Swiss-Prot record:
HAMAP family: UPF0298
Lineage: Bacteria, Bacillati, Bacillota, Bacilli, Lactobacillales
Superkingdom of origin: Bacteria
Localization annotation: Cytoplasm
Keyword Cytoplasm: yes
Species annotation: Streptococcus sanguinis (strain SK36)
Protein name: UPF0298 protein SSA_1730
Length: 89
């Protein structure tokens, strides 16, 4: 049976939108905002730390951040009445 690899999202800010194609070699591009010049890149869990250190050294990358999508609560039933304790800004 195929084992599922853990994946993590990286938010990569670019200087120019034309350089987004160069990042396709590092992982899967899920979303590209042309207005705000960033993209959401999915990579393997074991490669994420290495890429977070090495991608800002590229000339076309402005900043790299880890996505916090896995930390969000995805149980939406009754979420309007729940306390505001796990809010990520």
């Amino acid at each position: 049976m195929i084992e599922r690899e853990e994946r993590v999202g990286l938010i990569v800010y670019l200087y120019y939108n034309r350089d987004a194609k160069k990042l396709a070699n590092f992982g899967d591009i899920i979303y590209h905002s042309k207005k705000h010049r960033y993209l959401h890149l999915y990579v393997n869990q074991e490669d994420a730390q290495n890429l977070q250190e090495n991608l800002p050294k590229e000339r076309y990358v402005k900043q790299v951040r880890i996505s916090h999508i896995k930390e969000l609560d995805q149980n939406f039933v009754g979420s309007l009445y729940r306390e505001q304790e796990n809010v990520i800004i």
